[in-house]
């Protein structure tokens, strides 16, 4: 029986310090996998952040370019612009363009009794010297002429306003003609203008069309004005 149970007859494996149980190996492998997963997750987040930053940068650049183009178009469009000069205006003069707000004065006003008051076109005391003799008195050709002249001046003043407000700087050169041995203004030059047909259509519709502004209550129309409105036969 000793030969079966003798300790000397059995081989025992030595457990060296480097030998690790299977359960501990699985724990280390799990931890390693978790660490690798964490690293991959962090990497994906970093890639996502970088992509978002890159996309944001590209979007910001695109918006900046678009805004720059819009400003460029407004300033240097195909036809130019009012504050920076139109296409056919003199280049050297464009740099002196400055915008300002200006109120023109001198429009006639009418009192309830029909009296017409014509103030001076510029601020200051009224110049009444000689006005009574020019526009008031016995009917005469001279008196009628003075009133007509005043009406013409009023119309010319409106033309002056339009010229001053537009301030067209398109050069109008002179051209030499042998027949007269002199220079003469050559006005056949292109200008940047508003389409008058469109403006006229708007004015007509605004005056007597679907977009007409209603008259103030109590307004009494004269026959010429009624003809303009089309509510009085010729």
UniProtKB/Swiss-Prot annotation:
Pathway: Mycotoxin biosynthesis. The keyword DNA repair does not apply. Residues 1-26 are annotated as: Disordered. One of its GO terms (biological process) is mycotoxin biosynthetic process. Keywords: Glycoprotein, Membrane, Oxidoreductase, Transmembrane, Transmembrane helix, Virulence. A motif (HXXHC 1) lies at residues 151-155. It is a single-pass membrane protein. It is found in: Membrane. Its EC number is 1.-.-.-. Glycans are attached at residue 208. The chain crosses the membrane at residues 47-69. The 2 HXXHC motifs are conserved in ustYa family proteins and might form active sites. Belongs to the ustYa family. PANTHER family: CYCLOCHLOROTINE BIOSYNTHESIS PROTEIN O, YALI0B05434P. UstYa family oxidase; part of the gene cluster that mediates the biosynthesis of the phomopsins, a group of hexapeptide mycotoxins which infects lupins and causes lupinosis disease in livestock. Within the pathway, phomYd' catalyzes the desaturation of the Asp moiety into 2,3-dehydroaspartic acid (dAsp). The pathway starts with the processing of the precursor phomA' by several endopeptidases including kexin proteases as well as the cluster-specific S41 family peptidase phomP1 and the oligopeptidase phomG' to produce 10 identical copies of the hexapeptide Tyr-Val-Ile-Pro-Ile-Asp. This is UstYa family oxidase phomYd'. The lineage of its organism: Eukaryota, Fungi, Dikarya, Ascomycota, Pezizomycotina.
């Amino acid at each position: 029986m000793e030969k079966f149970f003798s300790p000397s007859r059995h081989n025992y494996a030595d457990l060296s310090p480097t030998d690790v149980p299977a359960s501990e190996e699985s724990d280390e492998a799990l931890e390693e996998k978790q660490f690798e997963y964490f690293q991959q997750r962090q990497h994906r987040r970093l890639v996502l952040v970088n992509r978002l930053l890159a996309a944001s940068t590209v979007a910001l650049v695109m918006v900046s370019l678009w805004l720059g183009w819009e400003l460029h178009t407004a300033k240097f469009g195909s036809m130019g612009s009012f504050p920076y000069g139109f296409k056919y205006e003199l280049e050297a003069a464009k740099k002196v363009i400055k915008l300002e707000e200006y109120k023109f004065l001198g429009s006639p006003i009418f009192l309830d009794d029909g009296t017409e008051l014509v103030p001076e076109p510029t601020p200051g005391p009224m110049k009444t010297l000689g006005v009574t003799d020019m526009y008031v008195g016995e009917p005469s050709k001279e008196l009628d002429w003075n009133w007509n002249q005043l009406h013409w001046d009023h119309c010319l003043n409106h033309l002056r306003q339009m010229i001053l407000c537009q301030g067209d700087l398109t050069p109008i050169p002179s051209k030499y003609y042998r027949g007269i041995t002199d220079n003469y203004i050559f006005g056949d030059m292109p200008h940047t203008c508003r389409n008058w047909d469109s403006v006229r259509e708007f004015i007509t519709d605004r005056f007597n069309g679907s977009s007409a502004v209603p008259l103030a209550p109590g307004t009494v129309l004269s026959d010429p004005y009624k003809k303009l409105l089309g509510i009085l036969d010729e």
